[in-house]
From Swiss-Prot:
One of its GO terms (biological process) is rejection of self pollen. InterPro entries: Self-incomp_S1. This is S-protein homolog 7. Transmembrane segments: none annotated. It comes from the Eukaryota. The keyword Signal applies. The gene is SPH7. It comes from Arabidopsis thaliana. Residues 1-20 form the signal peptide. GO terms for cellular component: extracellular region.
Length: 135
C-alpha cells in the first residue's frame, strides 16, 4: 500500500512539473500569421502569472509557438496580446489564449491561434477554425 501511495505522489508531482515527457506531454499554443500582405507583421506577447514570454514578431505564413504544463493547483492561465499594422495600437487584441480547467489537468492540448485580415481564429481539438475576435 505504501508503494502505491508513493507512486501516486510521484505521478502527481510529475504532472505539475515543467519537464515534459511522453507520458505527460506538454500543452502547446501556436500563433500563425495568415495576413494577405507580405509586409503585415504579427506581434505576439504572452504571459501568465508566473512567466512573461516576451514580445515575438511573426512574418507572414510563419508560426510562433511554445509549450507549457498545467499546474496541479488549477491556476494556469495565459493571456496574449496580438497586434499588427503600421500603428500597432490600431489593430490590437488582448485575450485569454489558454485557461486550465479547475478539475482536469490537461496533457498535450494544442490550440492554434491564427491572425487573419478580419480577426483572430482558433483551431483546437474541439473544432476547426472559428473566428473568436475581430480587430
Amino acid at each position: 500500500m505504501n508503494n502505491l501511495f508513493v507512486l501516486v505522489i510521484i505521478i502527481v508531482l510529475s504532472a505539475g512539473s515543467n519537464n515534459g515527457s511522453k507520458l505527460f506531454p506538454k500543452n502547446q499554443l501556436y500563433f500563425r500569421n495568415s495576413f494577405n500582405r507580405n509586409y503585415d507583421i504579427l506581434t505576439v506577447h504572452c504571459k501568465s502569472d508566473k512567466d512573461d514570454l516576451g514580445i515575438h514578431t511573426v512574418a507572414r505564413s510563419y508560426v510562433y509557438f511554445f509549450k507549457f504544463g498545467d499546474s496541479i493547483f488549477g491556476d494556469t492561465e495565459i493571456v496574449c496580446t496580438l497586434n499588427h499594422g503600421v500603428s500597432a495600437t490600431k489593430y490590437k487584441v488582448t485575450f485569454t489564449a489558454y485557461k486550465e480547467s479547475r478539475f482536469v489537468i490537461r496533457f498535450g492540448a494544442i490550440k492554434i491561434w491564427e491572425a487573419r485580415d478580419d480577426g483572430i481564429y482558433l483551431t483546437d481539438e474541439d473544432h476547426d477554425a472559428v473566428k473568436m475576435y475581430g480587430w
